[in-house]
Amino acid sequence: MNSPASFVKSLLAQCCLGGICEWVVCPGARNMALLQVLAAAEDLVKWTHFDERSAAFFALGRIQDIGLPVAVVTTSGTAAAELLPAVVEAYYQRRPLLLLTADRPAACRGSAAPQAIEQADLFGIYAPTIDLETPESLPEDILQDWDYASPLHINVCLPDPDPAWNPGSCDLYPAEPPEENGFRGSLAELARALRFKSRGGLVVMIGGLDPTEQAPARWLANELKAPVVADATSGLREELAHLALTDADALLREHPPAVLLRLGDVPVARFWRDLEDIPATEVFSVTRTGFSGLARPSSVVTGDLEAILHALGDIDTVGDVNGLRAMNKRRKALMEELLITCPESEQAMVRSFSCFAADGDCIYLGNSMPVRYWNSFAQTSIPTENVRANRGTNGIDGQISGFLGVSARCSRSWALVGDLTAMYDSNALALLPQLDRGTRVLGVINNGGGGIFRTLPGADGQPETMRKLLVQPHAHSFKAIAEQWGMRYLTIRTAEDFDQLDSLEENSQTLVELIPDREQTEQIRLRLANAQV
């Protein structure tokens, strides 16, 4: 058997020199040579998981946490295909996720030989492939053309594994990846809009931000003093509460601003989608991803937020030209009243959960409903800067994996996901023993199925057979899942049950099942939907 010793060692050394600082490794036979070198490289940070799909989302979480490139390593066949959901998410987040997939020799392609699929260009536009059919095809610097702004796929054809091969000493260390410089887009157009066009009203919408983006975004919002809609994942939702509009989609539809300035990722608020039908509002985005987030014309400036704002120069105060914050006070008061009168609703449970989670150093929000509820109902008294989510392209896929990746080095971390989300990704909890010791709380809102689908227009009028297909109702408890993975289990049905969270043990892993009252949840939804703007 042929062991591709120098080839594999050289490939992994180049990846390390290109800045790959952590490795998420999945088991297999075809990738054994890669695993043997990684096992011998004692100075590299390595994680392992049997589920490639989950492993890729865990790697994405690690990238979110450390801001550096991470690789996921798989064997051949559908093991490589399992990476696709996380690859798509990483593409739209512009994260440096490296996919290193082992492949059978190129002669097997198109043959339907066991565990042989067409792996070159497997991920389409989402991750270009560098296809290494032979050792001679390895370039001198395999990552030299990678921009680190989206995933990259290295597909390496390997002979049959040799379990007896000893790679010897493997002194591999990660180097610093290159820094991104400059920005793209028209600053002059943005500057004119802020200075002149904003006299007709300006609203600042802040999507997800990386930690280095929070200070410049905070500074700009405080300078402009315009109404702000800040997602929890911006890390600024609480700090900018004095400027904020709360649950203001209807208000903004009735009183659209002349100019909307978006900072960071695409916002979650419904009004962002409504902008498709409001051409009179000029939209300007300042974002590291470069995506407009809209199907209509808008202006996008792409790059480092701090560098862009520095280039803009002095910023004039705009203020709340249209008096939106004053008009929003009535809705804020109604929301607070409803949380008191419906304490067992999903909305009130999210508020209570957020009060406890605020003492953590990491919060993770999974799937649509927890994200939207958190943005509207979570506490605003205590700043929570480190809030993460994979919200862009997937709903329930890989959310627990992402949480564990983000929180792997945290001392106190909290997550809130839906019930279908938790069931879909529960095997990610097999990663728990590898993580740093710390207090982790996984909150699961169990509303008996896909609760968000019950709120879709016309859902109430659907026949029961259709509702089953749409909502996926169930009567499962999460106690067995907690026990399977060695987690403490708590159930919360009432406001008083939250007192249990006062007695969490240090370095404990706890699954908290929140079981809300459906009638109270629906009461809040209908009151807010029918309330005057």
From Swiss-Prot:
Q: What is its EC number?
A: 2.2.1.9
GO process terms (BP)? menaquinone biosynthetic process
Q: How is the cofactor bound?
A: Binds 1 thiamine pyrophosphate per subunit.
Q: Which Pfam families match?
A: TPP_enzyme_N
Q: Has UniProt tagged this entry with the keyword Metal-binding? A: yes
Q: Taxonomically, which superkingdom?
A: Bacteria
Identify the metabolic or biological route this protein is part of.
Quinol/quinone metabolism; 1,4-dihydroxy-2-naphthoate biosynthesis; 1,4-dihydroxy-2-naphthoate from chorismate: step 2/7; Quinol/quinone metabolism; menaquinone biosynthesis
Q: Is Metal-binding a UniProt keyword of this protein?
A: yes
The record ties this protein, via SUPFAM superfamilies, to:
Thiamin diphosphate-binding fold (THDP-binding)
| InterPro entries reported in the protein's UniProt record | MenaQ_synth_MenD, THDP-binding, Thiamin_PyroP_enz_TPP-bd_dom
What Gene Ontology terms describe what this protein does at the molecular function level?
Answer: 2-succinyl-5-enolpyruvyl-6-hydroxy-3-cyclohexene-1-carboxylic-acid synthase activity; magnesium ion binding; manganese ion binding; thiamine pyrophosphate binding
From the UniProt record, list the reaction(s) this protein catalyses.
isochorismate + 2-oxoglutarate + H(+) = 5-enolpyruvoyl-6-hydroxy-2-succinyl-cyclohex-3-ene-1-carboxylate + CO2
What family does the database annotate?
Belongs to the TPP enzyme family. MenD subfamily.
Assembly description: Homodimer.
HAMAP family associated with the record: MenD (MF_01659)
The record's function comment reads: Catalyzes the thiamine diphosphate-dependent decarboxylation of 2-oxoglutarate and the subsequent addition of the resulting succinic semialdehyde-thiamine pyrophosphate anion to isochorismate to yield 2-succinyl-5-enolpyruvyl-6-hydroxy-3-cyclohexene-1-carboxylate (SEPHCHC).
What is the official name of this protein in its record? Answer: 2-succinyl-5-enolpyruvyl-6-hydroxy-3-cyclohexene-1-carboxylate synthase
Organism this protein belongs to: Akkermansia muciniphila (strain ATCC BAA-835 / DSM 22959 / JCM 33894 / BCRC 81048 / CCUG 64013 / CIP 107961 / Muc)
The encoding gene is: menD
